A protein has these predicted regions:
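Extended hydrophobic blocks
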Residues: 1-123, 222-285
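A structural signal for short, hydrophobic/glycine-enriched beta-strand patches
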Residues: 112, 118-268
């Protein structure tokens, strides 16, 4: 309705250029949405080729197919409109359109706020820097993705104005891993950086992002009263992580490290889906 109201407002003006601009926008928006669907499918195949098959890596092509199916549905619906057209068919169609619009606008808002959050200024004084774990290479070594997180955390460690700051390596041991993710992070720090061993704490119980934060918070509170945290993860993951941090009353900020460009679309979709599941009551309401 907002979209139609804006269109009506523009066409109420007597300026021909404004009319032409609105026509261009009306045509451009569906074209861009259609192209985004094609892009996500292509990106999905690139991701599957580089990262291998997994349920998470299927999100990008699935989202692309869903977008294209919307246009197919609208085309089929247009073909059914005749003189004896049953208008009750509009009810499920309008429901589907409404669902697409709600989730579409929410996804755009999610992405915009995620990027804004990354650019927000960070305070320099923290008591702990949390390195969020990730899957391990051959079950015992850090992956390039996890290495970028660690390097970003080390950079923040040396830039900190707190002489007593500590790193928390956070991550439990998966069923296919030989050691915990926290231990792998610790090994990398000891072997490849100058961070003192006594400045590294291990949190080896967590299996999810939420637990990473919760258990790290509990660990930090054993050493400092009302500690401030800087949690380091990938840029696409910062917004959801900061949402969980607020839920558990953690004081601190998120810091994102770079991500391979081909991985970003699928990663943001995955983060969005995870956030929707966590906040499903908001969408249902």
């Amino acid at each position: 309705f907002l979209y139609l109201s804006i269109v009506n407002l523009v066409f109420s003006f007597e300026y021909e250029n404004a009319h032409l601009l609105m026509v261009a926008v009306i045509l451009l928006i569906p074209i861009l949405i259609l192209l985004s669907g094609v892009f996500l499918i292509i990106n999905g195949f690139i991701l599957l080729k580089k990262e291998g098959f997994s349920k998470a890596n299927l999100l990008s092509p699935i989202m692309g197919i869903v977008i294209l199916l919307f246009f197919v549905m609208m085309w089929i619906r247009a073909g059914f409109i005749t003189t004896d057209y049953n208008h009750w068919i509009n009810i499920p169609v309008l429901f589907i359109i409404y669902t697409y619009i709600i989730f579409g606008f929410a996804f755009v808002g999610f992405m915009m706020y995620s990027f804004v959050y990354l650019w927000l200024p960070k305070k320099q004084h923290y008591d702990f820097i949390i390195v969020h774990g990730a899957g391990l290479l051959n079950g015992e070594r850090v992956t390039p993705l996890l290495k970028r997180r660690i390097d970003k955390a080390v950079q923040a460690f040396y830039q900190s104005k707190n002489p007593h700051i500590r790193l928390i390596a956070s991550g439990g041991q998966g069923s296919d891993e030989k050691i915990s993710e926290a231990q792998a992070i610790y090994n990398y720090l000891v072997e490849n950086t100058d961070v003192p061993k006594e400045a590294i704490l291990l949190e080896e119980k967590s299996t999810t992002t939420y637990e990473n934060l919760l258990f790290s918070k509990e660990l930090g509170e054993q050493f400092v009263e009302n500690p401030r945290f800087l949690f380091v993860t990938n840029d696409y993951h910062v917004f959801r992580t900061s949402t969980y941090a607020r839920q558990i009353g953690m004081q601190g900020d998120g810091l994102g490290c770079s991500t391979a460009s081909y991985y970003i679309p699928s990663a943001f979709i995955r983060e969005y889906v995870a956030l929707c599941v966590k906040m499903k009551k908001l969408f249902i309401g």
